[in-house]
Structure formats: C-alpha cells, structure tokens
Amino acid sequence: RITEPTSGRGELFGRVGSLLEVGSGFHPELSGRENIFLNGSILGMSHREIARNFDEIVAFAEIEQFIDTPVKRYSSGMYVRLAFAVAAHLEPEILLVDEVLAVGDAAFQKKCLGKMNEVSKAGRTILFVSHNTAALLGLCNRGLLLERGN
C-alpha cells in the first residue's frame, strides 16, 4: 500500500501492478537489466518469474541494445517504456496506470493500450487514469469522471 485512504476503506483481492510515476522503483545508477529485477521484486514478482518474463519485458520496452546501460542515461520515453513493460508483465489481477502514457510516443501508447486490452480480456482489472478521452473510450467499459475531486 502506498498511502492509507483518507476516508473509507478498500479491499484488494490479488496482486497489484502499478505504474504511478515514471521510473518509481528504479535506481538511476543501475542498468536496465538490474532495474528490471529490482522493480519486478518491488512489484512482488519472484526472481524466477522475472527471469521467465525478462526477454518479453525487454522486447516490449524496445531497449534491447541499451539493456546494460544505466537508466540515468535513458530518455524519458525509454524510462517509461521499461517501467510499463515491467508492470504489465507482472500479470497482476489489478493494474493501476496513472497518466504515465503521456510520456511515450504515439506508437508506444498504442502498444500499451493493446497490452492493457490483453490484461482486461484475461479478466483482470485495470484502473486507468487519463485525460485522453479516446484512449479511455477504447479501453474502458466503465468509467468515473472526477471534477475538482468529486
């Protein structure tokens, strides 16, 4: 749990994958490879699970030639691609995605929406926060509109 609710309560059933801030859980001095294992562990993946998904994570993030480069040298787009790839390949029952796709280019945003559709079709829950109405309409079957916190 990141923070306690200010009121009410929530119950979660299943593993949660989150992408709330670009690169949260990444260490800038570590390579992409090392950060996949670090971030995967923080998100609750076992070492075996990370290793099993490693090649797919790297391919999805499109950072193959930079995998052993420290992430402090990554562009913001590379950073968010890697962060999304790790979170999405966690195979969570609940995936939280908050506005981070605004950083990626249009092709990667489309790829991410495709992955989120896969997650959704597998019967998992996605909590997707966005100002992109087209993305919301294409992905979501239910929505909440918040205006000034209400």
Q: What residue spans do the PLM features occupy?
A:
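A short, proline-enriched helix->beta-strand linker immediately N-terminal to the Walker B motif
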Residues: V86-V97
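Conserved ABC ATPase "signature" region
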Residues: G17, F37, E49-F66, A83-A85
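Conserved ABC ATPase "signature" C-loop
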Residues: R148-G149
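Conserved H-loop
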Residues: N132-G138
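Conserved catalytic segment of ABC-fold P-loop ATPases
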Residues: G138-L145
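Helical segment within the ABC ATPase nucleotide-binding domain
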Residues: Q109-A122
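ABC nucleotide-binding domain "signature motif"
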Residues: T6-G14
